[in-house]
């Protein structure tokens, strides 16, 4: 009887694990992997960083940097005329529209950053997207791995997602939406807002791209500065 119970437990575990599929990181999917809603031609997300570097005089220098970190499009930016491209590149962010804000402080350099999203419509008019939901509204219904990866990235607090040993994600279908589990091991305070540790988060996402639930389902201690 005990052997039957063990076999059934193993089979149920295998069946449950079979429902999960690995979710690739955002840069795995190309900019044309997304089905943009009608009238949308091009969307990009920019990261704005302000770095303070102290000097011996007790003051310091501040440098500002802008970088495009994500694109999705029906037509690439090169499709548009030079005047449209120039106007789009010059459109400035609004702090009230910023998302994924972060900061890093130390005895030496410190930095703070935020992200902003921008859109070109099919007529070549530039728009600021006001929040995360505006971004996901560009692609809903959310129903592909690429869509899910974008929604996860928008809501995740992880700063460094490049190391497969310390970061991974998987997803499965659940009712009319999806469940994502995000695993992250942080060895430094700067790469995870919750500090050093081994974390497993679970997200519930509907096809409108809304995160209906985000919860920490596991946390383990990890030594800061370790490997």
Where are these regions (language model features)?
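Polybasic, low-complexity, intrinsically disordered segments
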Residues: 17-21, 208
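Extended, low-hydrophobicity segments enriched in charged/polar residues
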Residues: 20-164
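A structural detector for beta-sheet-dominated domains
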Residues: 46, 73, 121, 130, ...
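Hydrophobic beta-strand positions in blades of beta-propellers and related beta-sheet-rich domains
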Residues: 117, 200-202
């Amino acid at each position: 009887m005990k052997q039957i119970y063990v076999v059934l437990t193993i089979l149920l575990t295998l069946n449950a694990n079979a429902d999960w599929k690995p979710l690739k990181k955002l840069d795995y999917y190309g900019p044309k992997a997304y089905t943009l809603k009608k009238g949308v031609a091009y969307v990009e997300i920019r990261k704005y960083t302000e770095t303070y570097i102290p000097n011996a005089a007790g003051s310091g220098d501040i440098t500002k940097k802008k970088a495009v970190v994500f694109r999705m499009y029906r037509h690439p930016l090169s499709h548009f005329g030079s005047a449209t491209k120039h106007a789009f590149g010059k459109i400035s962010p609004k702090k009230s529209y910023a998302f994924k804000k972060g900061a890093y402080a130390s005895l030496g350099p410190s930095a703070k950053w935020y992200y902003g999203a921008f859109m070109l419509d099919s007529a070549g008019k530039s728009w600021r997207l006001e929040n995360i939901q505006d971004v996901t509204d560009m692609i809903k219904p959310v129903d592909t791995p690429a869509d899910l990866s974008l929604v996860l990235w928008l809501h995740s607090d992880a700063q460094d997602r490049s190391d497969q040993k310390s970061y991974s994600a998987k997803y499965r279908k659940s009712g009319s939406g999806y469940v994502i589990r995000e695993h992250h091991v942080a060895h430094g305070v700067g790469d995870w807002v919750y500090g050093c540790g081994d974390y497993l988060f679970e997200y519930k996402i509907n096809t409108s791209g809304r995160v209906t639930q985000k919860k920490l389902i596991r946390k383990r201690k990890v030594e800061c500065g370790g490997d």
